[in-house]
From Swiss-Prot:
SUPFAM superfamilies: all-alpha NTP pyrophosphatases (SSF101386). One of its GO terms (biological process) is L-histidine biosynthetic process. It is found in: Cytoplasm. PANTHER family: HISTIDINE BIOSYNTHESIS BIFUNCTIONAL PROTEIN, HISTIDINE BIOSYNTHESIS BIFUNCTIONAL PROTEIN HISIE. Belongs to the PRA-PH family. The lineage of its organism: Bacteria, Pseudomonadati, Pseudomonadota, Gammaproteobacteria, Chromatiales. GO terms for cellular component: cytoplasm. It catalyses: 1-(5-phospho-beta-D-ribosyl)-ATP + H2O = 1-(5-phospho-beta-D-ribosyl)-5'-AMP + diphosphate + H(+). It comes from Alkalilimnicola ehrlichii (strain ATCC BAA-1101 / DSM 17681 / MLHE-1). Pathway: Amino-acid biosynthesis; L-histidine biosynthesis; L-histidine from 5-phospho-alpha-D-ribose 1-diphosphate: step 2/9. Pfam families: PRA-PH. Keywords: Amino-acid biosynthesis, ATP-binding, Cytoplasm, Histidine biosynthesis, Hydrolase, Nucleotide-binding. This is Phosphoribosyl-ATP pyrophosphatase. The gene is hisE. Its main location: cytoplasm.
Length: 109
């Protein structure tokens, strides 16, 4: 397993543990306690911030905001009973497919 996958797996494990924590002491638990809509709102906010950073052209801000987006995406995946390995497996499945072929496979065409 690559170091990148290791850090994603380790972070996902910590986030899963924090999901069960006291919402008064854990940001992750607080988000889960508020429900999926609150998590999705936060993912949307972070996605917007990443887009704005990219538009601004500051590489360090793009990386910083993308890290926030990935962090909150991992929380979303957890809320949906999924994890980074599921997403990585899907990316591996798609690797080598053209976008047109991948879309056709999804649509059963």
């Amino acid at each position: 397993m690559s170091e990148q996958r290791d850090i994603l797996k380790a972070l996902a494990e910590v986030l899963e543990e924090r999901r069960q924590a006291d919402p008064a002491t854990s940001y992750v638990a607080k988000l889960h306690h508020k429900g999926l809509d609150a998590i999705l709102k936060k993912v949307g906010e972070e996605a917007t911030e990443a887009v704005v950073a990219a538009k601004g052209g500051d590489r360090s801000q793009v990386i910083y905001e993308t890290a926030d987006l990935w962090f909150h995406s991992l929380i979303m995946l957890s809320a949906c009973d999924a994890g980074p390995d599921d997403v990585l497996a899907e990316l591996e499945r798609r690797f080598g497919l053209s976008g047109i072929d991948e879309k056709a496979a999804r649509n059963g065409q």
